Amino acid sequence: HHFFTGNGIGLNRFSNPISSPQTQTQTRSLPFPAIKAMKTMEGKVVCASGNKTVAVEVTRLAPHPKYQKRIRLKKKYQAHDPENDFKVGDIVQLLKTRPISKKKTFLAVPAPSRKSKKAGSSGELGIPLQSQQE
């Protein structure tokens, strides 16, 4: 009967839930980093004839269902190319975005070149190569 009259322990039960929405609003206002639920994919442009659209072929290694040998599987994705930058043969990275059309949910961006990483690794150590010493 304390619950209806407002006396005693009954009010203390409600004091805790009333304070919890305040803490929830504080946590929601914090700036959270963007969630990257999917890894970026890298592939080769195989068709660039459409306007602002490129077809990208992504190759991945997956185990064979029966023999478990890792085999190459290819899949084509339609990607958005807003500036029509890419041509057939370019290596691009696919970033997951909101759906742009029925089949386009990826954005094509230039892939970081692999050759520059290898060349820069020796310079990062600060030790000149033999060819640079002579």
From Swiss-Prot:
Report keywords, A-Z. Chloroplast, Plastid, Ribonucleoprotein, Ribosomal protein, RNA-binding, rRNA-binding, Transit peptide
Q: What is this protein called?
A: Small ribosomal subunit protein uS17c
Q: Where is the transit peptide?
A: 1-37
Q: What quaternary structure, including any partners, is listed in this protein's UniProt entry? A: Part of the 30S ribosomal subunit.
* Alphabetical GO biological process terms: translation
Q: Which GO terms describe its molecular function?
A: rRNA binding; structural constituent of ribosome
Record's GO cellular component terms? chloroplast; ribonucleoprotein complex; ribosome
Q: What does this protein do?
A: One of the primary rRNA binding proteins, it binds specifically to the 5'-end of 16S ribosomal RNA.
Where is the protein found, in the record's own terms? Plastid, Chloroplast
InterPro entries given in the database record? NA-bd_OB-fold (IPR012340), Ribosomal_uS17 (IPR000266), Ribosomal_uS17_bact/chlr (IPR019984), Ribosomal_uS17_CS (IPR019979)
Keyword Ribosomal protein attributed: yes
- Could you read off the lineage of the organism from its UniProt record? Eukaryota, Viridiplantae, Streptophyta, Embryophyta, Tracheophyta
Q: Where is this region: Disordered?
A: 106-134
Q: SUPFAM superfamilies from the xrefs? A: Nucleic acid-binding proteins
HAMAP family membership = Ribosomal_uS17_B (MF_01345_B)
Q: Which family does it belong to?
A: Belongs to the universal ribosomal protein uS17 family.
